[in-house]
């Protein structure tokens, strides 16, 4: 769809006081319409409500399992998402006594500079930015995966897209670049599911701890209704929140020493000691082959009785590594099957033993607690 150009056209004209750097606006399909076109099935509804309750129970120490958010760094093809879900489902069922498995299914990607921003923003991978198409593709994918029996996790990047997808999510994350943002803290206070805040890109945890405290309170903010109208939104606050350790510029922060320090920081702020650890990003030193090492360390801490670790994140795809995806027409046809086009991921073959080890660690912790 071509942009609807403003009177100022494609030139910068200081005589115009507003929208000088905006080329134009295209209509956005209302969330209410998309939800009606692509509704939630009864099977999906049960998967979503049950998994939300399970995650809440784990956070509140009413369930001694851990949450495992595992899946591709980003989704560029809905078919690959379903193919991955078909690998994940049997393993999730097998380990459900120890792990609450949620599939990572990220639709939008924050970029350090520029680059492909995700399935919603550019579903064709050609710079056409067919956002209305991307919204429908993404919602159908979410419906398909949840109907298959897999709960979903995604990152919250703006306060409009959740109106299209939040009813299908069981878990949300606020990324390292946006944890300090007031807008994202307000958004998290409105979401109907648990939300984790990552530590800052510099590795410090203070911004995430502040975010958890702020999100627990009600907020009044600018928002958009499902009909697409600008609105003043009032939130209840969200106490189902926790910190996600992802490492940073100063190095990894997944080891027992860092976890103990963060636990003390949370307690000092009068917050529950709930810690999820990301095996990727700064904790893997941006090398996907380090993720199993990180996971092994986390499992060992759990075996040793650490109850503050409530979850783990793993960037995993069907096949390992990553590939470049130049944004141009026809690029989709040239991509390798099941390989990430954003961050490098471990393969499914590498992922399955990581899940087994984490499950065994939870069972060992459970047995030790019973013995004591």
Swiss-Prot record:
The UniProt record lists the keyword Nucleus: yes
One record GO biological process: chorismate biosynthetic process
Enzyme Commission code: 2.5.1.54
UniProt keywords, alphabetically: Amino-acid biosynthesis, Aromatic amino acid biosynthesis, Cytoplasm, Nucleus, Stress response, Transferase
Superkingdom, taxonomy of origin: Eukaryota
Main location: cytoplasm
InterPro entries membership: Aldolase_TIM, DAHP1/KDSA, DAHP_synth_1
Primary enzyme class: transferase
Pathway the protein acts in: Metabolic intermediate biosynthesis; chorismate biosynthesis; chorismate from D-erythrose 4-phosphate and phosphoenolpyruvate: step 1/7
Cellular component GO terms, alphabetical: cytoplasm; cytosol; mitochondrion; nucleus
Reactions the enzyme catalyzes: D-erythrose 4-phosphate + phosphoenolpyruvate + H2O = 7-phospho-2-dehydro-3-deoxy-D-arabino-heptonate + phosphate
Location(s) in or outside the cell: Cytoplasm; Nucleus
UniProt GO molecular function: 3-deoxy-7-phosphoheptulonate synthase activity
Signal sequence segment: none
Family: Belongs to the class-I DAHP synthase family.
NCBIfam families cross-referenced by the UniProt entry: aroFGH, PRK12755.1
Job of this protein: Stereospecific condensation of phosphoenolpyruvate (PEP) and D-erythrose-4-phosphate (E4P) giving rise to 3-deoxy-D-arabino-heptulosonate-7-phosphate (DAHP).
The protein, known as: Phospho-2-dehydro-3-deoxyheptonate aldolase, tyrosine-inhibited
């Amino acid at each position: 769809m071509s942009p609807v150009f403003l009177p100022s056209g494609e030139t910068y004209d200081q005589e115009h006081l507003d929208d000088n750097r905006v080329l134009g606006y295209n209509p956005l399909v209302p969330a209410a319409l998309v939800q009606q076109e692509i509704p939630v099935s009864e099977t999906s509804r049960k998967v979503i409500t049950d998994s939300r309750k399970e995650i809440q129970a784990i956070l509140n120490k009413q369930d001694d399992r851990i949450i495992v958010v595992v899946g591709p760094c980003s989704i560029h093809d809905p078919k690959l998402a379903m193919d991955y879900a078909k690998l994940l489902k049997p393993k999730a069922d097998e380990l459900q006594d120890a792990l609450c498995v949620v599939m990572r299914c990220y639709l939008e990607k924050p970029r350090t500079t520029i680059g492909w921003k995700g399935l919603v923003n550019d579903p064709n991978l050609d710079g056409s930015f067919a956002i209305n198409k991307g919204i429908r593709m993404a919602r159908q994918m979410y419906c398909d995966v949840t109907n298959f029996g897999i709960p979903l996790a995604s990152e919250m990047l703006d306060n409009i897209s959740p109106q299209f997808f939040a009813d299908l999510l069981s878990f949300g994350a606020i990324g390292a670049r946006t944890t300090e943002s007031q807008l994202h803290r307000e958004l998290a206070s409105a979401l109907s599911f648990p939300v984790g805040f990552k530590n800052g890109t510099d590795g410090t945890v203070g911004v995430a701890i502040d975010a958890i405290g702020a999100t627990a309170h009600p907020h009044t903010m600018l928002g958009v209704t499902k009909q697409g109208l600008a609105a003043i939104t009032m939130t209840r606050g969200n106490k189902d929140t926790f910190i996600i350790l992802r490492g940073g510029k100063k190095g990894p922060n997944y080891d027992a020493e860092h976890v103990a320090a963060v636990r003390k920081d949370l307690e000092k702020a009068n917050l529950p000691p709930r810690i999820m650890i990301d095996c990727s990003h700064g904790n893997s030193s941006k090398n996907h082959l380090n993720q199993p090492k990180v996971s092994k360390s986390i499992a060992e801490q759990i075996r040793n009785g650490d109850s503050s670790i409530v979850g783990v994140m793993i960037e995993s795809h069907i096949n390992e590594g990553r590939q470049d995806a130049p944004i141009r027409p026809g690029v989709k046809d040239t991509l390798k099957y099941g390989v990430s086009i954003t961050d490098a991921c471990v393969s499914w073959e590498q992922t399955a033993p990581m899940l087994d080890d984490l499950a065994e660690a939870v069972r060992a912790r459970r047995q030790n607690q019973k013995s004591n």
